[in-house]
């Protein structure tokens, strides 16, 4: 999850259990709204591209372009379980990392990806922005490894700065209104709470347990995000990931921490070799995207790191 998905101040305090679909999330707390799924799924078009650090315009990044690519800030990093390919979601679209010198832009759709998660082989979910409307794309889906994208839900209404698939559901943090939301079918959503959080991670064992980075430190929910409590005596972390071995976190200074009791006790394991943007863990390997278009990996719990992508 991305470092810059900073906690925001909610506009109001809702009740829990609200469901919403489509363009609005403002119904009464106890009211459930289920709107028919969007018809005629369409491939999303190009997005306004933010300026890259030391790079050219978006025209430099066409589908299949490979080599010394600069992709700027990374908002998500994940492995495709089918191909074992490493993917990074950025302000200028989705890139596949083939080797330490080769990054391939996967899609012609210049999507500004703010949230990104992997469902299965070549099956991705994302959120972000599009220049040709809607400005907030809601939840979008790709079933061809990111080559094309289709609308799923909340088009025009949601900008998920955090997404995670766990326990058969999608968990998301909507930056437009501070809503923590969950969907079992990727179309209708239950708003669990409104709270100021950034990165979050769902327990792989218990779908009701969620850790999140709040304004005043780490927050824990034991009811699936409906309520949150502060976790005392924790390091000042900015990025989170959770796998079968425990919780992993990266602090703002790059320090890597781990916890085997759900965030109660923490052990410092090492540090990433740069300023962290995004962080993930899969199959006992830690991945970190760093400022400067660099991606690194660790197989010893963060003690040492090797380059997965480091353009010259």
Question: Predicted regions: what is each one?
Answer:
Residues 79-83, 118-121, 165-168, 204-207, ...:
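Residue-level detector of Asp-centered blade-edge/turn motifs that repeat once per structural unit
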Residues 92-106, 138-153, 181-192, 219-230, ...:
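Asp-box/BNR beta-propeller loop motif
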Residues 131-136, 173-176, 212-213, 251-252:
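Short, solvent-exposed loop/turn segments at conserved positions within beta-propeller repeat blades
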Residues 1-30:
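Terminal targeting segments of Actinobacterial cell-envelope proteins
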Residues 109-114, 155-160, 194-200, 233-238, ...:
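Short coil/turn segments at the loop-to-beta-strand junctions that recur within blades
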Residues 46-68:
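C-terminal region of N-terminal signal peptides and the immediate post-cleavage residues
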Residues 66-95, 111-116:
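Beta-strand-rich domains and repeat architectures in extracellular enzymes and scaffolds
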